[in-house]
From Swiss-Prot:
Membrane topology: Multi-pass membrane protein
Pfam families: NKAIN
Protein name: Sodium/potassium-transporting ATPase subunit beta-1-interacting protein 4
Principal location class: membrane
A GO cellular component annotation in the UniProt record: plasma membrane
Keywords, alphabetical: Cell membrane, Membrane, Transmembrane, Transmembrane helix
Organism name: Xenopus tropicalis
């Protein structure tokens, strides 16, 4: 297929998804966000699988990628609800760290314009190095940065899902048409040649 088709568009989308996922994975590692780290890892694996399937004309791999894209959209919708505190969700909770640490998003202290100040906690020994961290002057609150990340992931995943379905249908049609004309199966050609030779042999022995 030419590069202007849905196949090459899906390759481009998978590449963009890999770049966006790797960028997000770095900042989630910096913020010790273990649930997003695990989800990002699975997303990277599924995207590589979809990219391989698209390059190698493997519709089953592309279908697996499309199914994951639906799961990925659901996960990012949950993240948007989490950071916007929809319902009983609380962005200050330890849900995304599996309750093993009190870390928040890396952007909560390192966002655009944020100034991080530390003050020692009164009554705590200096050797324990406990301090109170305050962040002021942020141009954009960290939850909105996370929401924008998730919105971008949703957009790419939806486009990827649509093109994955299209590419899968194209691959399937090509396989069906290829099988119809014989494909790599040598039997039809061999069978025709054998039948022709048999007829010629029979005609040569007909009485004059």
């Amino acid at each position: 297929m030419a590069c202007c088709t849905g196949r090459c568009t899906l390759i481009l989308l998978c590449t963009l998804q890999l770049v966006a996922a790797l960028e997000r994975q770095v900042f989630d590692f910096l913020g010790y966000q273990w649930a997003p780290i695990l989800a990002n890892f699975l997303h990277i694996v599924a995207t590589i699988l979809g990219l391989f399937g698209t390059l190698q004309y493997r519709p089953r791999y592309v279908i697996a990628y499309a199914l994951w894209a639906a799961v990925w959209v659901t996960w990012n919708v949950f993240l948007i609800c989490f950071y916007l505190e929809v319902g009983d969700l609380n962005k200050e909770s330890e849900l995304l760290t599996f309750h093993v640490s009190q870390h928040q998003s890396w952007w909560s202290e390192h966002g655009p314009g944020c100034v991080r100040k530390e003050a020692p906690v009164a009554g705590v020994a200096e050797l324990e190095s406990h301090s109170y961290v305050s962040v002021i002057g942020c141009n954009v609150e960290y939850q909105y940065i996370e929401v924008m990340h998730s919105a971008l992931q949703i957009l790419l995943a939806l486009l990827g899902f649509v093109y994955a379905c299209y590419v899968t249908s194209v691959f399937t049609e090509e396989e069906d048409s290829f099988d119809f004309i014989g494909g790599f199966d040598p039997f039809p050609l061999y069978h025709v040649n054998e039948k022709s030779n048999h007829l010629l042999f029979k005609q040569s022995y007909l009485p004059a």
